[in-house]
């Protein structure tokens, strides 16, 4: 009996420490937000997410509610972890050579351009709707990884690594889009301060400073400066991640690097706290007044088309072209048929897509239809990808 209990506890710990465990918590938190928003306690849920909590920097209004703090503040750590993941892969992982980097990067570029064009094609003639062109460009690794792990032998280890690298590149490209296209009017003194802090972080790396707390302080100062500058403050996580040293020096060689220590400390926080909070705050869409025919309106139809059609077409065609031109090679035990199935899974756009939807339609009635399009497109993409990879004949 004791051995049985111990085995179950060990199994639970393994699950909680796995990507699938994190995805389950994110899904449960998101469902909780959705259920509360459509329950008799909807008013309490709305009051919680919109609780005033205002910050102003240099005359620029910052996050003013709890859900805004989650999106503009806590999500900075999510973007930081994304950058740390890709740096780790480049230094020691599956992206440690240019040819290994090329395939997922080219696929991610195709998976960004074609969905955006698909969305713009569907929403042409609706000027306000076109602001959401970037919503279908990102892939959510938190949900794609558990699906391909559940497929087991149907997806090779090399194919899994390729999809995860592509999803990370997708997130990075999404961050670039946010920084470039979704900022406010620039305030140059604050932008100059952000440049100074960035230069200090780069200098700290160059002169061999390996104290993580120094970079954490720099990240906070950079976040404040970016908030005042008009650029999106979550860019602070990206810049700090790029500046964190990936190597140890001197007597510390062989020990954990600052990058490793930061990733070890932040990944559980992001997985178990920040992403579930984000899902809980952003998926609480009330269905009151929403009719099925609203799903064919420009915004949700454009998002669904971008995720379900644009994503797989963009990723697959870019990957096929890069292999035909011998720019990159497919992973071992991976056919173009498998690539197509994995390309379908790339249409699972959740975290970044919701994030961009909030930025695209602030204080607009279009944000709820946008979220409905994200949910529908992501679910259909997950189902289509799973069915293809599970039941299609080997190519």
Curated annotation (Swiss-Prot):
It is found in: Cell inner membrane. Disulfide bonds: none annotated. The chain crosses the membrane at residues 15-35, 66-86, 101-121, 132-152, 161-181, 184-204, 219-239, 265-285, 301-321, 339-359, 366-386. It comes from the Bacteria. The keyword Isomerase does not apply. It is a multi-pass membrane protein. Keywords: Antiport, Cell inner membrane, Cell membrane, Ion transport, Membrane, Sodium, Sodium transport, Transmembrane, Transmembrane helix, Transport. It catalyses: Na(+)(in) + 2 H(+)(out) = Na(+)(out) + 2 H(+)(in). InterPro entries: Na/H_antiporter_dom_sf (IPR023171), NhaA (IPR004670). Gene3D superfamilies: Na+/H+ antiporter like domain. GO terms for cellular component: plasma membrane. One of its GO terms (molecular function) is sodium:proton antiporter activity. GO terms for biological process: regulation of pH. It holds the Pfam family Na_H_antiport_1. HAMAP family: NhaA. This is Na(+)/H(+) antiporter NhaA. It comes from Gluconacetobacter diazotrophicus (strain ATCC 49037 / DSM 5601 / CCUG 37298 / CIP 103539 / LMG 7603 / PAl5).
């Amino acid at each position: 009996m004791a051995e049985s209990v111990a085995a179950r506890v060990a199994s639970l710990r393994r699950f909680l420490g796995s990507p699938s465990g994190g995805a389950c918590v994110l899904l449960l938190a998101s469902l909780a937000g959705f259920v509360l928003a459509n329950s008799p306690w909807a008013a309490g849920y709305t009051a919680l997410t919109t609780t005033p909590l205002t910050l102003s920097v240099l005359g620029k209004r910052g996050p003013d509610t709890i859900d805004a703090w989650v999106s503009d503040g806590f999500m900075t750590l999510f973007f930081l972890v994304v950058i740390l993941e890709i740096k780790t892969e480049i230094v020691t992982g599956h992206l440690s050579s240019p040819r290994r980097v090329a395939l997922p990067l080219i696929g991610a570029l195709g998976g960004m351009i074609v969905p955006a064009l698909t969305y713009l094609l569907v929403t042409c003639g609706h000027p306000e709707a076109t602001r959401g062109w970037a919503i279908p460009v990102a892939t959510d690794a938190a949900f794609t990884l558990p699906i391909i792990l559940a497929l087991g032998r149907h997806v090779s280890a090399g194919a899994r690594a390729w999809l995860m690298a592509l999803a990370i590149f997708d997130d990075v490209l999404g961050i670039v889009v946010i920084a470039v296209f979704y900022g406010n009017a620039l305030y140059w003194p604050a932008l100059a301060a952000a440049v100074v802090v960035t230069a200090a972080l780069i200098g700290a790396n160059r002169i061999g400073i390996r104290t993580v707390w120094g970079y954490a302080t720099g990240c906070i100062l950079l976040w404040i400066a970016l908030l005042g500058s008009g650029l999106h403050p979550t860019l602070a996580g990206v810049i700090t991640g790029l500046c964190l040293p990936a190597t140890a020096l001197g007597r510390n060689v062989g020990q954990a690097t600052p990058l490793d220590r930061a990733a070890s400390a932040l990944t559980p926080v992001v997985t178990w706290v920040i992403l579930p909070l984000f899902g809980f705050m952003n998926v609480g869409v009330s269905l009151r007044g929403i009719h099925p025919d609203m799903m064919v309106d420009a915004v949700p139809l454009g998002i669904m088309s971008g995720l379900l059609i644009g994503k797989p077409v963009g990723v697959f065609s870019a990957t096929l072209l890069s292999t035909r031109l011998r720019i990159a090679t497919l992973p071992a035990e991976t056919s173009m048929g498998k690539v197509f199935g994995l390309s379908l899974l790339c249409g699972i756009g959740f975290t970044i897509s919701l994030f961009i939807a909030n930025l695209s339609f602030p204080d607009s009635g279009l944000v709820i239809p946008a979220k409905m399009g994200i949910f529908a497109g992501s679910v259909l993409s997950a189902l289509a990808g799973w069915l293809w990879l599970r039941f299609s004949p080997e190519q």
